[in-house]
Amino acid sequence: MKAHPVSLVAVLACMFFALVLCSHGQEKRQFVESRVSIKTSLPPGARLKEAKILSLQELSALPDPPGVEKNDTRYERTRIPAFPNPLGVKEGDVVTVSGWLHVVRLMGDGDYHLRFSPTADSVDHYLVSEIPDEDDVPPQLRPMIEAARNFVKSKVLAGKEPSRQEATLPNPLYIQITGQLFFNDVSAGDDSRPDAQGLHRASRWEVHPGLVLAFSKQ
């Protein structure tokens, strides 16, 4: 008995999409990260309405938490404790920061990687925020994550998905982002060196997960 042409096309289409989904899953599994459970969640009781407003310059000047080592296993599933600092903040606090968004990139783990700087004419001395994949966050955060990612696609990238290739926006946008203050210990203790593009990261502190984005006035 011959296969019906329409049925054959449907089967082939299903096989194609299954391969795409499988490939995406394998890629994410191969992308090894640290502190995933911390940077894809909020502490119990955290409220976005009580976010502390910080300038990009203030956050850039926030010192590293003392005693934290590179890829510190003590904090793989635990937030870094509070320490004395001029801003009175700690990892896990909800913060709101505004700056010029210069770079949007899709990472191997599905995160949207954003780079903000204090000026419109340069991405140098940037701060990082990342918006996780919806599948990687607790159910209560998924609506916010979906809205944040949709903002990036619709308001920043004209309806397109971010590229996996690092690209600078032709017209930087002044944007306010609210999310968790997170310390990226992957490079803790390393000297501050420029990246492959000759640009400097202003701080190891990030807004991660980034949850709410909006256009802002300077």
Regions found by a protein language model. Name each.
Residues 26-218:
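OB-fold and OB-like single-stranded nucleic-acid-recognition modules
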Residues 19-27:
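Bacterial Sec-dependent signal peptides at the C-terminal "C-region" and cleavage site
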Residues 9-20:
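Bacterial N-terminal signal peptides
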Residues 1-10:
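Bacterial N-terminal signal peptides that target proteins for export
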